[in-house]
Amino acid sequence: MAEYDLTTRIAHFLDRHLVFPLLEFLSVKEIYNEKELLQGKLDLLSDTNMVDFAMDVYKNLYSDDIPHALREKRTTVVAQLKQLQAETEPIVKMFEDPETTRQMQSTRDGRMLFDYLADKHGFRQEYLDTLYRYAKFQYECGNYSGAAEYLYFFRVLVPATDRNALSSLWGKLASEILMQNWDAAMEDLTRLKETIDNNSVSSPLQSLQQRTWLIHWSLFVFFNHPKGRDNIIDLFLYQPQYLNAIQTMCPHILRYLTTAVITNKDVRKRRQVLKDLVKVIQQESYTYKDPITEFVECLYVNFDFDGAQKKLRECESVLVNDFFLVACLEDFIENARLFIFETFCRIHQCISINMLADKLNMTPEEAERWIVNLIRNARLDAKIDSKLGHVVMGNNAVSPYQQVIEKTKSLSFRSQMLAMNIEKKLNQNSRSEAPNWATQDSGFY
């Protein structure tokens, strides 16, 4: 379903190496013309050192011989790699020393570690630049494990003020993502977020752009790490600076936030978060909507159950064709069906199983078994009257204390939204003038 494909929008905020998995996914799904995708890969590869990959793509795209320029580039890349390997070899040997490894594990101060290496191995300041250039070259060649290793060495030695410090964090995160090391990627994502949030040198506009990049890169981590669907809610919905970035620069990210909320396994948290999510979706509906956000609107704003059922069928097609969300399909459909059921029952309080079966597109027997399993697994507060064929929803009283907490949360959230709206209006004038952060000479972009 090309209509709802977000690859082009998302790719604008990704390093070119991170776009390749998305193009491979689209190729399998056959959403676009295969030749167009191959040409897209070839264009992306033109500014990398993955020459063998580029040659393979060229062979699949054209019937003629490999261009001479590509063969020459391969020779140049191999020569550069050998030269950088020779320059870096003595540095790598220092890090292979067992005592150096122990020092790196026990010393958190980069300056102390640098002094140790200088005393024991004659380490010099210019070695840091050599290490960084070699790591970047390895990354451009597609050797992400080598890049991650050397960027780790670089990171532990340089201060946060180093001109390549921030760039090395982006490179390390990209390398771990491309190797699918999700625990390491989550650590790098957290470290990079802290660096961006604590950066007092960047202008507000630069910080906004950096957060927008981080939001898009984080999708790889959040939808693959076991704790990702909790972390994405905390970051995207409850941290004002990141919610502001989504509303200002990339409202399409609401698709991923909404999916994370719907598929969250914590029922109590999910219900509270839904209230806050609905407010954001309503507010941004004029800038972005798709079947996933419209499903929430139909169900929780308009109470349009027929519309929600229709959108749910469309959601299935969207999820199947989305690189980040395809693995969420089963959880999404199951929980969405539960939301329809709960909302319908709360409005009517008591409802016949036959009517529910009709709403859920099930037979009465299937619907009754499904409801029994929900009650048994403590996912639903309800009782079944088998004689009358009715489902009666429970009515849990909310304590005054809990009511105060909910009201306070609501007020706090609305205050944040008001502040963001003011900031959003101020930023709109400068948005079109914002430079593309990817074009800055900062290393890994």
Swiss-Prot record:
Region annotated Sufficient for interaction with MCM7, chain positions: 351-445
List every stretch annotated Sufficient for interaction with EPAS1: 4-128
Which residues are annotated as modified residue Phosphothreonine in the UniProt record? T439
Q: Which GO cellular component term is one of those annotated?
A: eukaryotic 43S preinitiation complex
The family database entries (SUPFAM superfamilies) matched by this protein are listed as: Winged helix' DNA-binding domain
Query: GO: which molecular function terms?
Result: cadherin binding; RNA binding; translation initiation factor activity
Assembly: Component of the eukaryotic translation initiation factor 3 (eIF-3) complex, which is composed of 13 subunits: EIF3A, EIF3B, EIF3C, EIF3D, EIF3E, EIF3F, EIF3G, EIF3H, EIF3I, EIF3J, EIF3K, EIF3L and EIF3M. The eIF-3 complex appears to include 3 stable modules: module A is composed of EIF3A, EIF3B, EIF3G and EIF3I; module B is composed of EIF3F, EIF3H, and EIF3M; and module C is composed of EIF3C, EIF3D, EIF3E, EIF3K and EIF3L. EIF3C of module C binds EIF3B of module A and EIF3H of module B, thereby linking the three modules. EIF3J is a labile subunit that binds to the eIF-3 complex via EIF3B.
Q: What is this protein called?
A: Eukaryotic translation initiation factor 3 subunit E
Question: Its encoding gene is what?
Answer: EIF3E
